[in-house]
């Protein structure tokens, strides 16, 4: 058996080596006992934890700073969330790196401020699974395609957290590792892992305060006081892509269509009107795949594929249309999905 040599002291915090080792042993034991031998109990606990994470993002008061990491990209944001009993949710999300951006939200009404253009984009929120929210469906449905592992306790941003790993049951999706606040269930850190366990993307609070009073007034006032800003309301509307002749039925377990919409996209050619683009979004509860359809005649591009962190993109041509698939899934998943897409014009 290999011998492990320990230093007499650890320089971080100047803690005795004995205390450091004891903490490590306790953590390991906690993880071992947390998983247990009962898969039914593990699945039930994991489903409850997932649902609690999603509910906490909507029902808790919190404010803090979180960091998004993907490859060499590191971006910090400040978030404030107030959950009121009679007046819904108020949220402020502000970028701290790069060009300034601020998003203010009251329930599903979103106001995105772009200072360098003195622009305010007003639109309805389309997705409710942005960090620190998580799910696009129930925790039980997520576990139909992911295998849960309860990994015990840890600490994130100074708070005690419970750790859950979700391993895919197939090769169509990535694994996830989640840290949730032990007291409230709020998601503190989320990692997307490749098949080798390497981190592709991470979102993590570096500082957060949960509970107590959060003043909604600055958010409400910011929403009301838009004088001097150019207000833009993109005309987003629901669309029935199947009625138009599109057959979008992914032969990938777990993915369900959660919404379809049409929105204008700026033309690549100066002086040309916006291009109508149809979008269908499919989700397995954690990962999402978007399918964009736009006419070839109004957009010059090429077929191809690419990736950035966990996000992959695939561009294909189907007759007179460009099909773009975008999602936090392996490239092979997009390829398989694309192979099933058909267009049969309605007569």
Give each language-model segment a name.
Residues 16-28:
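Bacterial N-terminal signal peptides
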Residues 184-186, 193, 197-216, 322-347:
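Surface-exposed amphipathic alpha-helical segments
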Residues 35-118, 144-182, 186-193:
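N-terminal mature ectodomain segment of secretory-pathway/periplasmic proteins
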Residues 114-133:
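Acidic/charged, solvent-exposed loop-and-adjacent secondary-structure segments enriched in E/D, K/R, S/T
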Residues 227-319, 331-336:
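Short, solvent-exposed recognition patches
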Residues 3-19:
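Bacterial N-terminal signal peptides that target proteins for export
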Residues 30-34:
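Sec/Tat signal peptide C-region and signal peptidase I cleavage site
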Residues 211-240, 347:
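Short, gly/Ser/Thr-rich active-site loops of penicillin-recognizing serine hydrolases
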